[in-house]
Amino acid sequence: MSSLASQLKSISDKSASIALNRQQRSKIHSRSLIFDPKVAASQDYDEIYDVAIDALDELCELDSRFNKFKNSLFANDSINFDRNVQSEDVVTQLDQNINAFFTLLGPYYNFTAALRASEWLVRRFQANMHNLEYMILTALPYYMQPVFIKILNVIPKQNIPQIFEWLVTAKDQLRSPTLQVCFRAFFNDNHLFTFYSSFLDEQIKRNTTYKEQLVFYLSITIQLLPASNKNTLNETLIPVVLRSSDLMLTSKNSSLRLGAYSVLAVLSAVAPLSIELLNTLTFAVLANDIALEAQFAKQTVFLLIQLWTSTTELTTSEALSKTPSLPINIIEHIDISQAKKDKFLAIYFSSIFPSETSLQLLNMIELKGNKRMFKFVVHTVLSSLKPQHLNGGVTSNNNSTNYKDTILDIVRKLIKLDQATFDEMLKSFRLTVSELELTLEGSLLATHSGDEKLDEFGDNVDRDDDTEYTKFVDERQDDKEDGDENTKFDISKLGASAPTYLDSKYNPEFYKLSFAFTRFCSKVDIKSQRAAILHFTHKVFQNPALSITFFVKSGIIFGCSIYMVKNTADGKTDFYLVLPLLLIAFNDPSSHIRAAFAQLVQLVSEITKAIHENKKKQKTLLFFESEVYANSAEKKMISPQDAIKLFAFIGSLDGMRLEEGKIATLLKSIFNGKFDKKTLGSLYQTFILNQWAQPSLPIVIKQRVWSISSQLNEMGVNGVRTYFWDTDIKPYLAKREEWLVQAKEAKLADYYNIVEKSLVQLVGGDHLSAEDSNSVSHWLCQALDSNTSLQLVANERITSIFPKLTSVESKVIILSKLVDLLVSDDYVEFDPMITLQSLPLDSAVFLQILENVKIGDQMPEQGVVKRRRRSSSSTKQAMAKSDMTNLASQHLRKLSIILEVLEVNLRKASIANPKLLKVLFKILSDLDYLGNDGNLPILYAQEVLASCLLLSISELKNSNHKHQLDSNSVRADLIVNSLRNSSSPQVQNRLLLVISELATLAPEIILHSVMPIFTFMGAHTIRQDDEFSNDALQKTVARVIPALASTNSGSFTTEIEFLLASFTAAFKHIPSHRRVRLFVALTKTLKPSNSMHILIYLLGEQYYQAKMQKNALEMRDIETFVTAYLKAFAVETQLNGLDQFSNLLNELPRHQLEENSKIYDQLRSRPIFGLAVVNSTTEELLKKRHALLEYLNSVLELDSANFDVTSLKSRIDIALKESSENDTLVLPQIRHMTSFALSELDIYTNTEPHPEISAELFVMLTSLVDLLPVVKFVESITEFLDVDKLGDNTAIKVGRNYAVLAARKFENEISLTLESVVENFSDLDKLFIVLLKGIERNVDLELQQAYLNLFAVITSKLGVDAGLTAKFSSVLIKSLGVITTSSGLLSSESEIVIASISAIVSIVNVLGIKTLGLFPKIIPPTLKIWEQTTTTTTATTTRSISATKIGRDEQNESSKLVQESVLLLLSCYIKKMPSFMVTTLDSVILTILNSDLTESQIKSSIMNLIIDRVNIGQVFKSLCSVWTQRQFYQSKNPASLGLYLNSMESTINKLEKREAISEATVFMKWLIQAFEFRDYSEKLGPPIRYQHYSSYGKFFPFVCYCLCHETQRMESSFHSCAIAYVMKLNDKSFRPLFANLVRWAIDGDNSIHDVAKTSRLLSFYRFFNKLQELLKSIVTSYYSYLVDATSECLKSFASEEDKGNKDATTLRRIVLISLSLSFTFDQDEYWSQQGRFDSICQPLLDQLSNIEESIGKFLVKTITNFVSDISSKEHSEVVLKGLVKFISYDTENLSNTKIWTIRTLKSIFQKMGEQWLSYLPILVPHIAELLEDDDEAVEIEVREGLVRVIEKVLGEPLDRYLS
């Protein structure tokens, strides 16, 4: 861009927000982020600031950094800040602040507060023009969201920089750009990417980056790098990317670091990077310590692999060499190719070699098949050594020396991988293997392991060892002479003094020689070690036997050992005694050890065979005899021949050589094998195990012996454990510490598993005798006392061998010990309770152990009387002693534990028996004794005991055997006693369950305790709010009641009544949510036929008690419960229960009973009646009967109130429909209850009158009959409705009740279908006849009304089905003739009239047009009836105030109901026959509107119905006719007038345009009269409802206000109707009407009333103003009809003729508003036409001469709009001259005139701005004069108002011009 272009661009940017005209300023100001442009254009800065500052506060809550902008961009004085007049430095600082704000705003664009705060920067500082780059850059990450489009939308298109031109399309289309569009823009413009990256770099430096920005940058960069060509990458992208990545890596933001990793990984994949750059990047990545922390380690390693595998070179990294702590273990699990892993590992290996991790790194590299990488690694290793020959030796550098062993292992591995290549590389370094070995001080080619050496020695036993040994001695002598360092170790000083090393007491000497032996061998070359060992043996040990004990114990056996045996063999020495010790080695895990010992056994076998085979007897020396049996008094040995057989059986030992653990199987075969002699197996067993059991053997041998022997014991080999019992097992506990010391010396790490476990496994096993079992139990109990790990082993052994113990005593010993451990406070390594519960125990064990903890043994007690609790008077004193209490407490704890174990076993196995049950009952009694007399905590023990009792009884009950229980021990009274004494609900519930189970097992035991049980449950259990109590209660009842029933006792009913009485007595204490389920389960258990009615009655008794106490809440609870309770049963069960309840009511005495009478005794003995009933007085009995009936009715009513399938009524209907057989289950009960109700009704109506009981009986009767379905119901009530059978008042009352009930029943019926009625057509037809006959007879007013209502309801239901309508149409037509007579519609009683209308409505709804023949008999009489209601109302309103207050409600209530009924009938005819209602439509509308007693909502709905159903044109004519001809406007009810106007507006809205045009004349006539309504109403005075306030002067202003308000509201409705009508007309049809309206307003043409001109003009201008607001410029030209009239009005206002006239002031205000609207909406320069201008200009300006204060602002606005509207300069000058006249001192003007003129000029300057600055020379002199005006108000108005506005427009002070 040229210099000139740059300067022009800069100037353009700076002046972008400067507007030279009003339209441009408005356009700039209307650009908004949150407001519509039209709204934004009208806003001032104060409003925008308020919105923005609230948003800033929200942002400050999100980020406190926004607070700093409160004193700059969002300061209070920023409202008046204008950047266009500021200095360059101020503007620069402003831009920096705005850019900083947008930078900080980036993360929060999704919050609405962000845009609302940005609104201030856009609107006040034009940030959308001057700071648009930052707006776009910060919002660009949100390119897919609407907020980005909003930001683009406020940026002017011409201001968008060229770098963002690609966003213009998105701005034009208001559509978000896609990611592909963004990428294409960055791809095509490298400068854009550089620009955005620079912006991001600045964000990173300021720590203002955010997630969306980083995601956007990465998505663009990662796509851009692979898509760019090589030149672009190298020249542009890579430098930019690397700069940004470097900043990201130095940041502490984890997201930025990971973003840099992503970019660098992609970069390394698309472009080859130099080694120098790779090192630089690696340094940058690892520079921050967090790179290798847990959260970044994996990503860091992955990136490093990507970077260093991107190059083709294999080289050492300087950067990686500085990082020896790289977490290489991550590389193994990282998801990347193996080739890349190997390459990176090789580079890293080379970079840090040598180090601690070098060998680990090498093991991770796959070098096979990759010769290049192998050479690279070898080169690294050899280069690090740098060998130099110094003094004949070879050494390496210091670093290599530090890791000599590691390098040695690495070199060996490399040689093993590829020796040929390694040798090749050695040659290139001019090195040999020997030199390398010297450097590393180790052998490189010795690859044989120690085990292989051992095999080698074993395989070469036949070599000439004498020669080798001689050679070794000679060499050693030469070395000694040469002064070799080996001479420092002199074995001649070592001397073995012990006779054998198989005795543990010689352990110190053994360990000393072992150390010396190891040290000696380490000094000898590997090839000479065998000879060295022979030399050591020869020099140190006295004889070969001693040396063998040394090697056997140490576990070291070489070829030299075989050599010693072989050399010792002289044909006279037997070696077979050593066989048992040699066999121990076959348990060693090492196969080489096992192989070596196998060779040794084979050698001994060969020697033995050589000596004794084919020879009878030969005396030989037993090798090893003294060593093995040194301390043994008895030597168990075998003969040589038996030894040969044993060797033959053992065979080659190949299996043991190859597989570990085979020795035990071999020994089992030997011990159980069949030889020539039957006892040979046991002989071998004795021989081997006797030697193994020698107590002197050290721990290293013993641990293997015990391991093998324990395996044999587990295999079931008999007698194995006996060999070790006395020598090892029995004394083990005493010698354990000694064994531990030996194990520590022998470095046996895991003593628990290696030694102790094997030993304890020898304790017990199969084939135990009773005595052995006891011994085993005692030893294990002693082991449990050890407080060491031995406890764990002993516990495990107890678990495994417990079933094998043969005596009960031995089991009890163990159980007692475990219980003691639990009771004691000592620490135990295991949980004894788990062990106890896992042991299989039988009843004999439990009987024995329970006997041991029996309390009777510790505390003697007196004999117990059967079924009586023992006395505690003598024992409390004894229990008071502390030692006795402690002892009892101890035994209680033991008992609790044993009972817990018993409970577990009862659940697992069948161990229950009567003996155990007897003991448990004895314990139950003892626990009760301890709890009451000893005050001990027995609750838990009782609970566990109850569980044991329950399980035992259940098991006995379910067994196939019949058990005889001891009734003296197993007693229910003991359980009841514990129940009463226990305070624990859990114990009580479990004991109840025990009773329930005992009732099924032995019913006779619990029979005598039933009453106490029931009493307890009613007093305690039933009140508990938990599932367990509820379950226990139900199970107890379920088991006890059948037990009672099975006894065939005559008191069974009494027992049930007693049980239910006990339970219901606690009803209020039972949790409410458990009541229903509890009593339902109880009823089902007792059988509903036995208990439901009793329960209902007992709850009725409680209802009576609550009523007497006036406890309504409790009464309601009982009603609700019984309702829910009944729903849980089948319908026939419910009815049966209610029926039996009525029987109990019948049994209730009617009068007070005589004492000792028969019925007295009968009722007294029944728990449900008792003394409370038999001792009641007659009055009390009547109250109780009334309460019980009320209770029953409440229940039935509450049940039927819920219309669902669970109600009794619905279920009866379903049952009767399902099957006809159900009739016999349902109907008899209802008939029986109905008979009861009728009989009782007769008694308490006629015989013993009692109105309250009679009323309840009527309700009961109604409820019972209501239960039946409609069909059955009709059948049952018809005879009760026949007037011929209603002989007395009671029958009439019953008939009325049935009629009401029937109406309600039919009303609730969902529908009547033809199918459901046809079957019972005769019944329904008969019902119609009965009803019509009752209507005609007029027997009783209430009865006749009920019949009419019933008829109406049934008829309405018939209309649902077309078939029913046709079937009954003739009956319904006939009924209309009856209903329209004096017996119905023409009756003098309003109740009958209302009911008749209801019946007529139902018939018309059903038959419709078929009733047209009776139209004259219905509509005209109905309208007359309505007129009678208005006459009554009028008479009421004309009475005195006092009379109105007294009787208004009573007299008007019936009239109101009649009016509503009439309106209902009219609406019915409008629905069914709308076309036939047209003839009377005027009357109908008047009837609806004048029904003042009816609610407006009802009248409104009927009027809407007329508008919807009747021809709309006819409706419109009728509405106009009602107003103009029927003079409805004279109505005194404003609500009716409002309803009329609403209906008129709705009609007009629905009217078609064609009809509107045709009826325009009619409407104009109506409109003129409507406009005259104001004047008419004001002359008429207040409506009737306000007239009575006229005598109260203080209320009269309120009356006037209400009148004015209602008049204005109706006038507004007139305008709405008029405008709605005008909108349906065109210009051609409306102009004549408008001209007529103007003539009426001006001249009074077509005026009906004598209305003043001012009033007419008021009405007209009000209407015309609303028309202008709606149609705007469309009606501007209509002003031609009234320009002159308006001018005349203005002149009259200015002439002060009407000054002080309120109407004139109002008219003046409305005329000014009218002119202002016309000026505002003028778009065709209508008022610029000279004639119109002349006729309106001066009259308008003249208003300033006498304008009222209240309307001055309207004049100012009108003149201002007038000046703005006129376009020519001449017109403006005319206006200016006219205004100057009113402020000039050449003419006399009032101060008020000057002030309003000044305000007008101020408003003009504010609106016209610079356009009026040209008139400033004319105004300045006058302004100067006004500033010196005598009136201070004038001076202030000029100085504070006009001058400031002019200065703001002028841009400089006015003082210079004024001076």
From Swiss-Prot:
The chain crosses the membrane at residues 258-278, 1392-1412. Disulfide bonds: none annotated. One of its GO terms (cellular component) is 90S preribosome. HEAT repeats lie at residues 578-616, 1819-1857. It is a multi-pass membrane protein. Keywords: Membrane, Nucleus, Repeat, Ribonucleoprotein, Ribosome biogenesis, rRNA processing, Transmembrane, Transmembrane helix. InterPro entries: ARM-like, ARM-type_fold, BP28_C_dom, HEAT_type_2, HEAT_Utp10/HEAT1, U3snoRNP10_N, UTP10. GO terms for biological process: maturation of SSU-rRNA from tricistronic rRNA transcript (SSU-rRNA, 5.8S rRNA, LSU-rRNA); positive regulation of transcription by RNA polymerase I. GO terms for molecular function: snoRNA binding. It is found in: Nucleus, Nucleolus; Membrane. Involved in nucleolar processing of pre-18S ribosomal RNA. Involved in ribosome biosynthesis. Component of the ribosomal small subunit (SSU) processome. Belongs to the HEATR1/UTP10 family. This is U3 small nucleolar RNA-associated protein 10.
